[in-house]
Amino acid sequence: MLTTAACGLGALLVLVRSVSARRAAKEKIQRARTRRTESLHRAEQVVLRYRQSHPSTDSALILSLSLSELTKRLQEDSLSPEEVFYSYMEKTLNVHKELNCCTEILLESFEQLKTISSKKEGLLYGVPISIKDNIAYKDHDCTCGVVVNLEQPAQGDSVIVKVLKKQGAIPFVKTNLPQALLSYDCSNPIYGQTLNPHNPQKTSGGSSGGEGALIGGGGSILGIGSDIGGSIRIPASFCGICGFKPTAATGPMAKDVDSLALCMQALLCDHMFSLDPTVPPVPFNVQLYQSSKPLRIGYLESDGYSQPTPSMARSIREVKALLEQAGHTLVPYQPLRVNKIMTEFIFRGIFADGAISMIQKLKGGPVDPCLQNQVNLYTIPTWLKRIISFLLKPFSPRFPVILDAVSGVKSIPDLWKQHAAVEVLYADYISETIAHWRRCNIDVVLCPMIGPAFNFNYCGQISTVISYTALYNLLNFPAGVVPVSTVTADDEEELKHFKGIFQDRMDKLLKKAVTGAEGLPVAVQCVALPWQDEVCLRFMKEVEHLVKQKRK
């Protein structure tokens, strides 16, 4: 009797705690949404007052200027920081209503604007800049779309925000991202799903998807994202803008390559080097970026692990032809052992603990639909994962290997063994890849970029396609994307016959994910060797220029 009563009481306590935790999470989410609504409302009121007192401000002209043109006019005083700021703030508010891309307006930006004219300095003087939600801004949450991170405001600005402010920029809005940043979709239980600026039935991509949508929709001229597996490049591709992952993981997103280069020039300054000694104290090499020397370019249509969609492959062929016509040399290139690298380094490396750390982070609140399929997979008992993996091996080459990789290691000694083995293999792989580049005698690589934009709820089911982006995070190579085309009716027709390399579930899902994309942007990816960021950007600029010339 006593034992039964004790068990019943224990079960009741667990239930009460669970209900209480869910209620607390719900209340936290509601408070966060209220803060966002209030910040948007206050910004709308200030913009309205400015509009009433400055009816002659030509916002259409301001929004049409490139970053280089805008900074020139700000420096010359032919435009004021106020005119630029309020034009972009108003546009951001309108874009957000359509795409749900912002997590909070940084109301401190109004105060910064008041003092900016007294200190007219910096390469980005008077430029309003958007920043991804996970970038620290004093007194604001870095939620990462996770409930447990709510109401824990940053104690100070991140280094990148400090440098941007020093260069005269005005961070004015934080943008949306997927829950826990472990998806290339853009939805979380706090702020919801961000939509694609070209088609609201498609995702903006992620994890810097709020940035992609806001810039693609015209609400920001320059944004800062982060990229640990393609998180700048994928939303840039999906939203039809340019994005750059430097040798380091945090980088700019904008509508053109010159804007990316100007931002990198602004960031690689003495202030950055003094605040963050881990950044090599090497200023941006403008001469290297502006070089017109013909390049020797390696190119690939497929990495042999994930079959590119028809529009991805076509874009590579078209850009290759343009580059050859412009006098560059194109040679076939194939990355080394992508299949093994994806399994051993990417999946097994990220999920060495069997995804326990990530699941713990999610326990404080609801799981977003864009992450639910992944979480379902991770929470399958390890013994069952291994059985399923064994049974599926004859029928599906990739999924069983991924399932086995995300099962994690069996013990702490095994973790150390894996860590030691990966360290050696990782160093060897980088050396081998660089040696492979040298043998091919290439300066840069042109490769496919994931796209076009996916239909909702597919990103979390297709992990294989990130081979095109995550490989360069692993190698620590600078990589960027440039929009070069749009999906054609012929691409859609060819997609009907798409089988993929392995003809497995992942290939079938990829086909479904990109169906119905006619007219959506398609990009290519440009890659260079470590710390040759200027070379990568110069290559991107060349691609951009040739594509624009062709359109004329």
Please give the residue ranges for each predicted region.
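Enzymes and membrane/adaptor proteins characterized by extended Gly/Ser/Thr/Asp/Glu-rich
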Residues: 123-163
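Amidase signature
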Residues: 1-121, 266-474, 484-518, 531-535, ...
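Short, well-ordered beta-strand elements within core beta-sheets of diverse protein domains
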Residues: 69-76, 130, 148-152, 249-255, ...
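Short glycine/serine-rich loop segments
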Residues: 157-267, 475-483, 523
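Peri-catalytic substrate-binding/gating loops that frame the active-site cleft of hydrolases
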Residues: 145-155, 243-244, 298, 310
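Conserved hydrophobic/aromatic pocket- or pore-lining residues that grip, position, or stack substrates
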Residues: 88, 126, 132, 164, ...
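ATP-grasp fold ATP-binding core
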Residues: 119-138, 171-174, 191, 446-447
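Short glycine-rich, flexible loops that bind phosphorylated cofactors or substrates
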Residues: 139, 179-180, 306, 454
